[in-house]
Amino acid sequence: MKKIIFLIFLVSFLQSCKSTYVIPAFSSVKTPSAPDYHKEENWAVLPNTYSKELKQFSSTQIDTLQADVFYVYPTLNTEKEDLRWNVPLDDKKQQDKVINKAVLFQASAFTTSGKLYVPYYRQAHIRSYSMLDVGGKEALLLAYADVKKAFETYLEKYNNGRPILIVSHSQGSTHTKFLLRDFFDNKPLQQKLIAAYIVGTVIQPTLYKTIKPMEKPNDIGGFVGWNTYKKGAYPQKKHFFKGSVTTNPITWDDQKSTRLKQHKGFLYTDKKLYKNALKIEVTDGLIWSTNPKFPMRFLMSFIENYHSGDINLFWQDIRENALLRTKTWIKKTN
């Protein structure tokens, strides 16, 4: 017990020892080179480049899958000492995070529903959100320009008229909100949209003209989204979340609470699935979760914001739901 108390004290002490970094002004001249998405090296994942670890969670017959999954990963550049506004695509550290964290514990949930496409992009540093007026907006727009270009190349080179699942988290969802607007909303391509999982961002139900929140487990052609916090906790700017789409990621309907036995599975970093691990409550703009039952539960008791677990906390629930929606789309359109 003394050792645990010491570790908690040490972490708190180290966090309090903050260094001051001078953030350079955003400059379009100094941004990393724009990617060419016709080159495979600029894609983290294509159907023919699955890593050994990803294959463990994927369909054994990828070629038979009738849908595609276009996934945009969350903010991974969070180090304060990194003064770059945007990350170059060939940054090995970021590439490792994309493949072995984001893809492995988020995108993997969708690999039985469709072929996975994950573009690298010049991701904006996390500070961009708190410094929108002094470079953050430009950094995020640059990142979206890459995502947009990647999607255009995907449509041109890979899609071949197949139905699409759009999947994203955090900064990725900042970009896919625009992607839905620019390519799907009130446009012919909406007919190919199975579903959009726009997770870890605030999204209002009236954001689009013709794309609506999905309210049943087998709804198609719309979107779902949620933000997860510890039960009873609120974000600092909780008013931003009020009225936003808050999908129940366990029942996928209008149920406001769930029981342990309804939870299908939380994928932890040990790559094990923990079933019946949590209960949730849907409140205005937030999903409140109990402390999940898994080996590191004690440490989770000190965390209120479950943002990083928005997807893998409900990994198996999402996996089964994505497959249901995909099968529903195929059945209705054939």
Per-region residue spans from a language model:
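Positively charged n-region of N-terminal signal peptides that target proteins for export
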Residues: 1-4
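C-terminal motif of bacterial Sec signal peptides marking the signal peptidase cleavage site
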Residues: 13-16
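Surface cap/lid and interfacial helix-loop subdomains adjacent to catalytic sites
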Residues: 18-19, 148-160, 182-328, 332-333
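Active-site catalytic motif of lipid deacylating hydrolases and related acyltransferases
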Residues: 22-28, 73-162, 295-312, 316, ...
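Structural recognition of the beta-strand scaffold that forms the well-ordered cores
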Residues: 68-72, 117-120, 165-166, 195-198, ...
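Gly/Ala-rich beta-loop-alpha elbow adjacent to hydrolase catalytic centers
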Residues: 168-172, 176
